[in-house]
Every structure is written in C-alpha cells, then in structure tokens.
Design a protein with these regions (language model features):
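Intrinsically disordered terminal tails
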Residues: 1, 13-14, 732, 783, ...
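Extended HEAT/HEAT-like alpha-solenoid repeat tracts in very large eukaryotic scaffold/adaptor proteins
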Residues: 1-6, 26, 42-56, 85-97, ...
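Flexible loop/turn segments at the boundaries of HEAT repeats in alpha-solenoid HEAT proteins
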Residues: 6-23, 57-68, 99-108, 115-123, ...
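Short, surface-exposed loop/turn segments at secondary-structure junctions
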Residues: 12-20, 143-144, 327, 416-420, ...
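Alpha-helix boundary/capping segments in eukaryotic regulatory proteins
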Residues: 12-20, 37-47, 57-68, 82-87, ...
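Amphipathic alpha-helical segments within extended alpha-helical solenoids and repeat-rich scaffolds
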Residues: 16-37, 65-86, 111-140, 153, ...
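Extended ligand-binding groove/face enriched in aromatic
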Residues: 17, 30-44, 56, 60, ...
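Long alpha-helical scaffold regions
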Residues: 253, 264, 273-276, 289, ...
Length: 907
C-alpha cells in the first residue's frame, strides 16, 4: 500500500489530478503511518512521505477543507510524548511551508491563490509554533535537534508574502512584507531575543540560521509598526543584540556566521533612518563598535572580502543621510568614517603585495563584478570628508607615481616583480579615483571646492597616462599587471568624461579646468579629449594581444563617437584625423603581391578587415550611410576582394569572413539600397557579386572532399547561395538589362550557384540546418523570379530540383516547408498561366516545362498527395502557406479538377 502511494508522487508533481477521495485517503494513510511507524523509519523515507503529503495537500487545497487539517495534524504530533514524533511534526510544518512557497508545475495564478490562502490562515500559527518550540528546546535537547524549529522559523520569514519571489542565486532581498497580524509578535521583545540566544548557545550551523532569521526580522517593512515607540523598541533590541556580539566576538570566527552578521549590520540603514539610530541610548557605543569591526574586517580582506560589501554599504547610507539629519545629537561619523575610508584604501594597496607573494591567480582586479561591488560605496565615504580623503590618496599615489616615472627612464625594467607590484598598487588607486569621479555628490562642502579636489585627483591619473606609454613601459604591453593598469585607466577616462567633458560640463566646471590648466596645461575639454583619443589610438596599436583592453577601448571610442556633443568634438581633433587617415589596412593589402597573400600576416589582416567591414555594413541602416560605405568600396577596393577569394578559395578561414561580409553588404534592409533612378549602382553591385560567386564557385567545385566537408566546402557554399539570394530579391537590380546587353553576369552567377547546390547530396542538405535554409531560400528565389532559368535545364536536373522541394515539404522546419510550398506554387502557377490557360503560342520555357512533365507525368500528382497528407495527418504550424500550392496543383491536374466538380454536384 505504501509503495503504491509513493508512486503517485511523480504524477502529482506534473498536476495529474485524481479523485478527491483518493487524495484524502492517501494523505490520511501517510499521516497515520508516520504516527505509528515514523520514529523507526530512515530519515530519507520520512522526508519523502512528508513531501508527498504536502504535495497532495497543496493540490487539493481548494477541493475540500479537510486537506487543510494537516496543520492541526502536525500540531498533534507535537503533543505526543515521543520526542521523535515532536520533530516529525516540525518537519511536516517545515516542508508544508516550503511546498506552499514554490510554484511546482501548477499554473502561477493557482499557486498564488493557494499560497495567499495558506499565508492568511496558517503561516502565523506555524511561526508561533516555531517560536514556542525554540523556547521549549532551548536547553533540553542537543544542538542538532534545535535546528529544526529554527529552520521552520527561517522558512516562515522567507515566505513570499506578496508574490515577488526572491532570486535564489542572489543574497540581496528587499523588504519583508509581513502582514499586520504579525505585529504583536514583532513587538514582543522575546521574538528577537530568542534568536540572539540561539546564536550564543549553539554550534555554527544553528547559529548561522539564527542570524539569517535576524536578517529577515531587520528587513520587515517600516509600516508594520504603527507607532514610533514600538519601532524604536524593536530597533533597540536589534542594536543591543548586535552590540553584545561585537563586544564578545562570539561565533565570528566562523566564516558563515561572520558573513551573515555583516549582512545583519548592513540592513540597519536600509529599514531605519539615521535619526532613529541616534535616538537609541547606546548609539555612540554601538557605532564605535561597528567602526572597529569594519576596520578589522578591512584588514582581514582575504578572509572577509565577500562580506565587507555589506559593511561599506551601511556606512555609505549613513553618510548620505547626514544632510537630512535634524537632530542635534552627534552622529560620530566625522570621527569614524575617515578611518574606515583610509582602512579600505590601505587594505587594497596592501592586497597587491600579498597577492603577488602568494602567487594568487584569483585577483579582484580581474573580476569586474567583484571590483564594482567593492567600489560601489567608496565614493560616498570619500566625499563625506573629501579634503582629508583626497590628501590621503594623493600622499599614497605621489611616491608610487614618482617611482613609476623613474623606472620609465631606466634603460632596462630592472626588477620585474617590483614593477608589477607598483603597477598593481597604481591600478587600485586609479580604480578608486575613477569610482570617486563617477559620483558627483556634495556632502559637507561646496561644488567649487569639490571640483578643485576632483582636478587634483584627476591630474595624477592624467599624469600617469603620459608615463605608461614611455620608456621601458612601452615594452610591457603583454605583462598582466600593465594590462590591468590599462583597463583601470580606461574606466577612469570613461567616468571622467561623463562628468566633465562636453559643452555643458565645460561651462559648469570652470574651476576644474582652471586647476588642470595650472597642473598639466589642459585648459579646456577639447585639449583633454584630444589626449583621450590619443590614448585610444595607442591602446589600439599596442594592446593588440589583450582582448579585454581592446574591447574596453573600442567601447570608449564608440561612446565618444555616439555622443551628441563629443561626436562633433571628435571631428575637430588632430588625433581623430590621424586615426581616420591611418586606420585602413586595405591600401597595403591591395599592393600585396600574390605570393605574399599566402602568408599568415596578410591573411590575418584581411580576415580582420572583412570582419570590421561586416560590422560597419550591419550598422548602416540608411541610404546615406550605406552610400558612404559603397562609395568607399566601389570601384577602388572591390578588386581586393576578388583577388583574395581567387587566391584563397581553399582556405575557409579567409573566404568565410569575406562571404559573410558580402552577405551583409547586399542585404537591402530598411531600403538602404535604394539608388537614384539615374544611378547604375545596383547593376554594378550585382556584377561584383557575380564575379565573386563565379570565382569562388569555380574553384571550390574542383577541391576534393576532406574530412571536415562542412567546414571546407558546405559552409562556403551556403553563404554563397545566401549572398546570391539576397542580391536576387533585393529589388535594386533590373535583371533584364544583362540579357539585353549581352552581359553574362546573371547567367554565370545562376549557372555556378546551381552547380554548387547540385554538388551537395540531398541527405547532406537536409542534415545541415544552415545549408538547408540557404539552399531552399535560393531555390524559392529561382522559382519566383528566374523560373525560366530553371525550366531551361535538362529534364533530370529539373526533376531532381522539384524532388528536393517535396523532401523539404516533409521536413520539420516550418520555414523550409514554407519556402518549398512557395516555390511549388510559383511553378504550378506558371504551368497554369502558360500552358493550361494560355491563349497564344507557348514560350520556349513553357515548351520545356511541358516536355519535363510529359516525361514525368506523376510529378505534380505526387506533390499534391504529399501536401494533402501533411495537412490532414500532421499538425503543421504553416497550414495556410501549404494550402496555397494545393489550388494551383488542382487547377493544372485535369482529372482531379473534374472529380472535384462532379463531387460538388452530388446531392
């Protein structure tokens, strides 16, 4: 019996509902079984049985009120004499709360209705049971048993009260929205105190959960306390408990406890105002202990690196509240915050030497997310007493900058390890200054004085920029510490530009530029921007092997070019003119001899050029911008593409970027290829496409099949077909011109593309998704716009192509089957218009089609049969598209048409 009930657990999880009485019987049976045999069962069996009961309860919650008796039945377990039954009851409640809090496989709306009903009726009662159990088990049982009621309390406090589930991958959560009915419990001092008591007297596993409960209690919504005294009393209990932990340090040697305690401290300023903290009698003692704890944490940066964030967040929120403080009570932040700021900066500087000595591969400077997290709160702390903080930073940076400058003048780098340490320390200082300049918030001093201090700090970094690319430092671009420094400088430039570069910033930041003029001769933002662009050019030239620096540099350059004001300013700069004049490698490639084109240097340069051009082509979304690119390429630089594809047709690493660029270049998106009526550019573009396709196809067909046939041949073939398809259906070429003037461009392109497509077996076409999409897209274009070319083929080739269309109809890809249906519709419509219903003499193409069908009379009926089978027996998502060729095929199939007419007249 029990085995059969357990087997229902899987169907239940997939919402396979059974009659209500069956579910009730199973739930009651399991509860009774646990009551009789539970203490003798293995733990995993008890857990599975409880999960089953909770799942049944949730799925039957609104079906019968008897399902809700589970809370009472669990409470009955607590009243039994056996200690084992007591903990089984706690486990039932624990899993019940968890089950009600997760959606499982049921609809989200139904889940929320059940969860809200459970929350309103039973969650408070269960939380009260957990508190009662905590008091009862405080000294009667071992530590392992005390964890059960604590876990139950934590699960109750972690319940999704308002339908906004917390991201389980993140430690951050917002306010805990406890219902108003929970107010008496929170106002009871014993509620908070019991968790502090459990923290003191239990092992680390239990004490960590006690702190987690306190973190959630500290996060309850402010409005749950109707009166200020009750909120103050609640805050006082939290501060008193944390003060005692800070004084004794009990449990903080465990990393889990330490981390949760930092989270608890971080929640104080999230839910409580600074004025409320000041109203607590022992605030001065408490804030002093928190400051001391923070300073020690900063010194133990290796052990507490992930926890310091919450402490710094607390202090940053405290200092940002000072301007709004109306109380005369001293906040003591003037004495504590500078020490914390200096402690953080010192710990970062010292961490470089320690990391280097330990040969640590996990460096914070390489992790952007962790670095951002650590520096997020620092600007507010530094600007609280900006003058003192800036002096402290400058006093640390000046000797390092001087030593780094002296090293640049030496003939050799000297001790490379020592130089790497200096670069690492400078990197941290640059990151710190960049973070400070990112936030322009005045706390305790005027805007003008802050600008002067910003100028002092920025001047040191700008001076460092001038040194990094001189002397022996210009030989160290491959060194990791130098690359980290390069990334830090780019972040500084990005933040500084956003704050102080631009017309509006220029007029509102006169004090800063006046000071920079005195220190470095940078008297306005145009001169400063020129220096920034010069650094960008240097990075692009020297950091070619460091992808991170290049990527960040290009992002900065894009940001400058995309800005309304900075984009205009860039055009005035000498550095920009130099980059524009010297950025292109195409001129050098055009002059390269054929033999030299085989070298790796030339190949890599060409590959990079094609990828860059493809990116540019993707960004040209208007006629004007596309015209600029077209005029730059044609006619002077198109021979380079033809030369490359002719010489390197057997090297897909060269041809693939080239063909992908052309595939993007010929795409008429947003009507960007709409030329003037007197312009031949559309025809000229297609001629260049034809040359490339013919040059590539004539060579690729001669190559033998290798082991990687897709990479060596098929990939280039499908991209070529995509290029030609886009050019044929781009609606910017009048193709009749080619035949009229005897130009073979169209005929040669169609001929070689068909040969390439026929060289691939049908099984391979269907096996490779990208190849099949390109092939059937190409065939659809041929049948819709160039059907005469298809009809002039020999009969076997024609029948093979039509047979591939039938195979495409049977495929699972609706896009491909739609393309096949469209091609068949075009063919059948041509047959009907030019043969079945033709008035005049048939054209040569019509005669060829009639000859093909005469030799294979079952061709059209077989396709019609296939279409009917798909529509009738398969659940196709494109039935409308598949139905279009059916009418055309019926109209050209005389026997079928007569049969349908007779059937229509039968009564």
């Amino acid at each position: 019996m029990l085995k059969s009930i357990l087997c229902t657990f899987v169907p239940l999880s997939t919402a396979n509902f059974k009659p209500i009485y069956c579910d009730l019987f199973e739930a009651n049976y399991v509860i009774n079984y646990l009551a009789m045999r539970g203490p003798k069962l293995q733990t995993f069996v008890i857990k599975s049985l409880i999960q089953l009961v909770c799942r049944i309860t949730k799925f039957g919650w609104f079906d019968d009120d008897k399902f809700r008796d589970i809370v009472k039945e669990a409470a009955d377990f607590l009243s039994l004499a056996s200690q084992d039954h007591y903990f089984i009851g706690l486990k039932i409640l624990y899993h019940l709360v968890g089950e009600m809090n997760q959606a499982n496989a049921m609809p989200l709306t139904l889940h929320r209705k059940i969860a809200c009903s459970f929350k309103d009726q039973f969650l408070l009662q269960i939380f009260q049971i957990s508190l009662t159990s905590l008091h009862q088990l405080k000294s009667e049982v071992p530590d392992d048993f005390r964890r059960d009621p604590l876990s139950l309390a934590l699960r109750c406090l972690s319940f999704d009260f308002v339908g906004c589930p917390v991201d389980e991958s993140s430690e951050e959560f917002g306010t805990v929205q406890l219902p108003a009915s929970w107010r008496p419990l929170l106002q009871d001092p014993s509620t908070v105190q019991i968790f502090f008591d459990y923290y003191k007297v239990n092992d680390t596993c239990v004490s960590k959960e006690a702190l987690e409960c306190l973190v959630r209690l500290a996060s309850v919504r402010r409005s749950i306390f109707v009166e200020d005294p009750s909120r103050t009393q609640f805050l006082s209990h939290l501060m008193s408990g944390t003060k005692e932990i800070l004084q004794t340090g009990q449990g903080l040697a465990d990393h889990g406890n330490y981390h949760e305690f930092c989270r608890l401290l971080g929640r104080f300023k999230v839910n409580f105002q600074l004025s409320e903290l000041l109203s607590i009698e022992f605030y001065g003692e408490w804030i002093g202990l928190v400051a001391e704890f923070t300073t020690k944490s900063l010194l133990s940066w290796q052990w507490a690196s992930n926890s310091v964030y919450y402490l710094l967040s607390l202090w940053s929120r405290l200092v940002t509240s000072v301007p709004y403080l109306k109380s005369d009570t001293p906040s003591m932040l003037d004495e504590t915050v500078p020490k914390i700021t200096e402690g953080f900066i010192t710990s970062r500087i010292n961490s470089v030497q320690a990391s280097f000595a330990n040969d640590s591969s996990d460096d914070t400077l390489d992790n952007v997310d962790v670095l951002q997290e650590q520096l997020e709160s620092l600007p507010y702390l530094c600007r609280f007493q900006y003058q003192n903080s800036s002096i402290y930073i400058i006093n640390i940076m000046e000797p390092l900058l001087q030593a780094y400058t002296e090293r640049s003048r030496l003939p050799a780098p000297g001790d490379a390890n020592e130089l790497s340490v200096i670069e690492g320390q400078l990197t941290w200082l640059v990151h710190i200054i960049a973070a400070i300049l990112k936030i322009r918030q005045t706390i305790g001093c005027s805007q003008e004085s802050q600008e002067l201090i910003d100028a002092e700090l920025a001047a040191r970094v700008l001076q460092l920029i001038n040194v990094t690319d001189t002397g022996v430092h210009a030989q160290r671009y491959r060194v990791l510490s130098k690359q980290r420094l390069g990334r830090a400088i780019l972040i500084f430039v990005q933040n500084f530009r956003r704050s102080y570069v631009g017309d509006q910033a220029m007029h509102s930041s006169k004090q800063l530029y006046a000071r920079l003029s005195e220190l470095l001769g940078l008297n306005d933002h145009l001169v400063l921007l020129n220096a920034i662009v010069g650094k960008i050019a240097t990075n692009l030239k020297c950091y070619a092997e460091c992808e991170d620096v290049i990527d960040h540099t290009l992002s900065l350059f894009l940001e400058l070019a995309s800005g309304y004001m900075t984009g205009k300013l860039l055009l005035k700069l000498e550095s920009t003119k130099f980059i524009i004049a010297n950025h292109s490698v195409a001129v050098n490639l055009e002059a390269t001899a054929d033999a030299a084109f085989w070298t790796d240097v030339v190949k890599y340069a060409f590959i990079g050029l094609m990828r860059d051009l493809r990116g540019i082509a993707m960004a040209t979304n208007s006629r004007r911008t596309y015209g600029l690119l077209f005029d730059w390429l044609y006619p002077s630089r198109m021979p380079l593409l033809l030369k490359a594809i002719s010489l390197c047709a057997d090297e897909p690493e060269v041809t693939t970027p080239l063909l992908k660029f052309m595939c993007e270049f010929v795409l008429n998106k947003a009507q960007r290829l709409t030329f003037d009526s007197s312009s031949p550019n559309g025809i000229l573009l297609f001629r260049e496409v034809s040359k490339l396709i013919v040059a590539y196809g004539s060579r690729i067909l001669l190559l033998p099949n290798g082991t990687d046939i897709y990479g060596s041949k098929y990939k280039g073939i499908w991209i070529s077909l995509a290029v030609l398809s886009r050019a044929l259906c781009g609606n910017y070429v009048n193709f009749g011109v080619f035949e009229l003037y005897g130009d073979r461009a169209l005929a040669d392109a169609l001929d070689i593309s068909l040969k390439m497509s026929l060289s691939v077996p049908l099984s391979d076409i269907l096996a490779f998704k990208k190849l099949s999409k390109a092939f059937y897209g190409y065939i659809e274009v041929l049948f819709s716009s160039h059907i005469t070319f298809v009809l002039n083929l020999d009969t076997n080739t024609f029948v093979h192509i039509v047979s591939t269309l039938e195979s495409g109809l049977k495929g699972l890809d609706t896009g491909i089957s739609t393309q096949c249906a469209s091609a068949i519709d075009s063919l059948a419509a041509f047959y009907f218009n030019n043969i079945t219903a033709a008035d005049g003499p048939p054209s040569p193409a019509a005669l060829n089609l009639a000859r093909h069908i005469g030799e294979f009379p079952t061709l059209f009926p077989q396709i019609l049969k296939t279409l009917f089978e798909i529509i009738i027996f398969e659940d196709a998502g494109n039935q409308w598209s598949l139905s279009r060729p059916i009418l055309s095929l019926i109209m050209i199939s005389e026997q079928v048409l007569v049969f349908l007419k007779l059937l229509n007249h039968v009564p």
